């Protein structure tokens, strides 16, 4: 039986072609498939009976994801690419021995064209993968006839049979000029990249002549060659024929949330996709541009040769900061890929909204399961806390409240921490003690109801700090549990009890799903508040209101000084070296020296 989480996601699947990825409890992809209709195909795994390896695979599925494509064939090729990248356990088990061909031009003094199942870094040209082995072979044979290279085994002192048939340039008996090979390879590359107009026109004319001369078998053979070429070289939105490494970004915004898709194009294929969903604090344009810039500050994200973005962004500023070209596709395959990323962004966000609506209708019993897992009597109210800061700067905490499994948003609270006065903002224990002290001291003073359970995002440091304040300062007996995440930053388990016992919940249970929602919600709420506060103190924000400091000047200041304090401490001469007048430089330092209005404590 499918978990509530999977049941909800099944109800949101679109009636569109695409590739789906089954994941285990750790978020690892264990199976990749394709579908003409994602809704029907994915639902069949959980709504029909299976046996053998398929049943074993389904029993391991804790979640799934999908990527929408424009055609069935794109779904097929995307499936191939993802299988080759992730090597999912059950694809290997279910499809052992299955390979997908590439057409290759070898990197040799006398190159040849061949079919291969493996890409190697050997200097050769690779085209594919192709979904139809027979069609790829027929196309290769056609190329050998029309654009011959070497078809023999090399020099043997006399012309080979293929040379007499016009299918070999003659490496068998002569030294073929390198330019002759280079020109021929360029023709083949154009042909395999889809520029087949001349070849098809020539074949069509030959087919018509053969039919006119009553050579019907020859005409049928040429007709089949045309069919194979069209089938093999059909242009794909997913498989780019340009080997430039690219990252493609697009987004969709609605109801205060932004959904971002990142397509990683490597070796002429979509190698990976990342999705992000988060609430919008500024405009969609500002959030999107900020996301792109922060994306490449992450340790594992290597910059590509080119970044593609939708229209409406400041491409020049992005390119200057990233130091790589940032372009907006205007036509052709890249524009189609951009539209596909936008479509996936929209589907992802609309799915989230529908899932949230379903969540609110299916939380009965979830709180009971959660309390039972902790061996506690039935409770109704849970309050969860999370902290947010950037290396200790602008530290904040946030609290969300859930009543009978439903978010009680009127009771959410934000806390601007006094870290600068009392402790380091990166001290999680001190942050926890402060927010717990403030929250429950106030409830005691107001004689307000206390929660049945407190959840701390983090681990034993946060949990024990909260228990210390409650028990030793406020004399309160409220159960406290720590919400633990795995290495993929996903909800994994609870810490609870005097011995900090790790409690693993059934990931398919309503209780686990409620815990996951609470953890995601408090994290979202804390991050949103921190962004709002940090924006007030950020360099870019402070610079925007200063007369004479326009976008270009802001960019220069950002790149040279990085922080407000460095500008404050810089001599006027250093600022003027950027082409800024003395009057503007003085106004800049005066404005930045003035303290911003303090935020009201909640």
UniProtKB/Swiss-Prot annotation:
Transmembrane segments: none annotated. Residues 15-92 form the GIY-YIG domain. SMART domains: GIYc. GO terms for biological process: nucleotide-excision repair; SOS response. GO terms for molecular function: DNA binding; excinuclease ABC activity. GO terms for cellular component: cytoplasm; excinuclease repair complex. It is found in: Cytoplasm. It comes from the Bacteria. Keywords: Cytoplasm, DNA damage, DNA excision, DNA repair, Excision nuclease, SOS response. It holds the Pfam family UvrC_RNaseH. Gene3D superfamilies: 5' to 3' exonuclease, C-terminal subdomain (1.10.150.20), GIY-YIG endonuclease (3.40.1440.10), UVR domain (4.10.860.10), UvrC, RNAse H endonuclease domain (3.30.420.340). InterPro entries: GIY-YIG_endonuc, GIY-YIG_endonuc_sf, GIY-YIG_UvrC_Cho, RuvA_2-like, UVR_dom, UVR_dom_sf, UvrABC_protein_C, UvrC. Residues 197-232 form the UVR domain. Belongs to the UvrC family. The UvrABC repair system catalyzes the recognition and processing of DNA lesions. UvrC both incises the 5' and 3' sides of the lesion. The N-terminal half is responsible for the 3' incision and the C-terminal half is responsible for the 5' incision. Interacts with UvrB in an incision complex. This is UvrABC system protein C.
């Amino acid at each position: 039986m499918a978990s509530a989480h999977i049941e909800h996601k099944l109800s949101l699947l679109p009636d569109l072609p695409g590739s789906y990825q089954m994941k285990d409890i750790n978020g690892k992809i264990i199976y990749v498939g394709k579908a003409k209709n994602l809704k029907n195909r994915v639902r069949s795994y959980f709504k029909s009976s299976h046996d053998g390896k398929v049943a074993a695979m389904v029993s391991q599925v804790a979640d799934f994801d999908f990527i929408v494509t424009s055609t069935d064939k794109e779904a097929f090729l995307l499936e191939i690419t993802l299988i080759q990248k992730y090597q999912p356990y059950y694809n290997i088990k279910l499809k052992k021995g299955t390979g997908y061909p590439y057409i290759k031009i070898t990197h040799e003094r006398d190159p040849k064209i061949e079919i291969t199942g493996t890409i190697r870094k050997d200097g050769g040209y690779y085209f594919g993968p192709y979904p139809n082995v027979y069609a790829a072979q027929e196309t290769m044979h056609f190329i050998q006839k029309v654009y011959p290279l070497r078809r023999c085994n090399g020099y043997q002192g006399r012309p080979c049979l293929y040379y007499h048939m016009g299918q070999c340039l003659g490496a068998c008996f002569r030294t073929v000029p390198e330019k002759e090979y280079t020109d021929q390879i360029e023709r083949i590359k154009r042909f395999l990249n889809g520029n087949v107009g001349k070849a098809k026109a020539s074949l069509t004319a030959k087919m018509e002549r053969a039919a006119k001369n009553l050579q019907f078998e020859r005409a049928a053979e040429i007709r089949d060659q045309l069919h194979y070429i069209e089938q093999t070289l059909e242009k794909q939105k997913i498989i780019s024929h340009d080997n430039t490494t690219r990252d493609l970004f697009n987004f969709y915004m609605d109801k205060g949330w932004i959904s971002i898709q990142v397509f990683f194009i490597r070796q002429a294929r979509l190698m990976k996709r990342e999705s992000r969903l988060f609430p919008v604090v500024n405009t969609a344009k500002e959030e999107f541009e900020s996301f792109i810039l922060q994306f490449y500050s992450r340790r594992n994200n290597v910059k590509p040769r080119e970044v593609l973005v939708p229209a409406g962004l400041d491409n020049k500023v992005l390119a200057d900061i990233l130091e790589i070209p940032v372009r907006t596709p205007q036509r052709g395959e890249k524009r189609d890929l951009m539209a596909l990323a936008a479509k996936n962004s929209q589907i992802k966000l609309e799915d989230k909204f529908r899932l949230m609506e379903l969540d609110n209708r299916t939380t009965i019993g979830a709180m009971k399961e959660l309390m039972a897992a902790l061996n506690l009597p039935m409770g109704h109210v849970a309050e969860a806390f999370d902290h947010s800061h950037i290396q200790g700067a602008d530290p904040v905490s946030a609290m969300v409240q859930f009543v009978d499994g439903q978010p009680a948003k009127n009771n959410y609270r934000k806390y601007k921490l006094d870290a600068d006065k009392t402790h380091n903002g990166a001290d999680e224990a001190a942050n926890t003690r402060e927010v717990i002290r403030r929250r429950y001291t106030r409830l005691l003073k107001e004689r307000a109801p206390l929660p049945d359970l407190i959840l701390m995002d983090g681990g034993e440091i946060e949990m024990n700090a909260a228990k210390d304040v409650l028990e030793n300062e406020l004399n309160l007996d409220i159960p406290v549990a720590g919400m633990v995440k795995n290495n993929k930053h996903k909800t994994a388990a609870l810490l609870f009890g005097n011995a900090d016992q790790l409690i693993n919940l059934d990931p398919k249970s309503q209780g686990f799903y409620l815990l996951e929602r609470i953890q995601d919600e408090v994290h979202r709420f804390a991050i949103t508040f921190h962004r709002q506060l940090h924006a007030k103190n950020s360099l870019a924000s402070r610079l925007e209101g200063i007369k004479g400091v326009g976008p270009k000047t802001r960019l220069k200041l950002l790149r040279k000084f990085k922080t407000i304090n460095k500008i404050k401490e810089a001599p006027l001469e250093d600022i003027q070296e950027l082409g800024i007048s003395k009057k503007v430089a003085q106004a800049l330092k005066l404005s930045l020296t003035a303290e911003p209005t303090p935020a009201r404590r909640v």
